[in-house]
């Protein structure tokens, strides 16, 4: 088990050795709290966008279903006639310059896997830059937009925001509720009291402190041809090689089991690079991966390689709440 996997296991299941990391946790907490205090006091260079900015982020390390929810937000806003843009850090991207506009024809090496997925799925204007403020400025210089979604960036306080949505894995929760490196939290748990909405991925119903949403398998898509098949394409009991290089790969493997397949699990690090050799598994079986992994594998995909497309389904209460926020943030003329 890799060191990162052992640490993740300790955060969520407990380990006495984590006590040794508490002095570093105290230092980390002071740094992040100082950043937030400066932001609240209006100190430093903080960019206020002329159009509303909605941050979709995490307070924990690891995957929470953020990208599918962003895809849902894009399409929901578009159905209301809104022009939406996205900014992202572009983790792992190696563009020739920053900021960099992501196009559907780019490689994942150039664009980053999550930004490329978003552009290929939605065709939305998307700019990557670790400096989210600079990304927003570049996006607005090239596009007329009504709303900007910030992919992650909850802790990027140089960009002012109008709405903060924080996602939490309903099954794993906040682990031991301690900050890095003694726990999985990027900011102290008290930070959740100041965000606009919490969304619990996998919750059966809305909670007193937040909304439920779930990820629903939508289709199997062939990497080579783009052919779409229903999720019952494989017979119950079918063995498949399951590949996931995401923040919480076990959630993906569990999803395949709910479809009554028998996945042979191959977990990789989040944003891991792939090659044909790395994915040359035995025995020879169909291979199913996440859509995020697929954008890195199309160039060398084999005929029986598929990705599972998933759609975010937020609760009706969240949809109504979000529409109310849009009415508050946007001029009435922009909304139907």
Swiss-Prot record:
Pathway in which the depicted protein is active: Glycolipid biosynthesis; lipid IV(A) biosynthesis; lipid IV(A) from (3R)-3-hydroxytetradecanoyl-[acyl-carrier-protein] and UDP-N-acetyl-alpha-D-glucosamine: step 6/6
Catalyzed reactions: a lipid A disaccharide + ATP = a lipid IVA + ADP + H(+)
Residue runs in coiled coils: none
Pfam families referenced in this protein's UniProt entry, alphabetically: LpxK
Name of the protein described by the UniProt record: Tetraacyldisaccharide 4'-kinase
GO BP annotations listed: lipid A biosynthetic process; lipopolysaccharide core region biosynthetic process
Keyword ATP-binding: yes
Superkingdom, taxonomy of origin: Bacteria
Organism per entry: Pseudomonas fluorescens (strain SBW25)
Name of the gene this protein is made from: lpxK
UniProt record similarity statement: Belongs to the LpxK family.
Keyword entries, A-Z: ATP-binding, Kinase, Lipid A biosynthesis, Lipid biosynthesis, Lipid metabolism, Nucleotide-binding, Transferase
Described function: Transfers the gamma-phosphate of ATP to the 4'-position of a tetraacyldisaccharide 1-phosphate intermediate (termed DS-1-P) to form tetraacyldisaccharide 1,4'-bis-phosphate (lipid IVA).
Binding residue positions for ATP: 60-67
One example GO MF annotation: ATP binding
Enzyme Commission designation: 2.7.1.130
Gene Ontology CC: plasma membrane
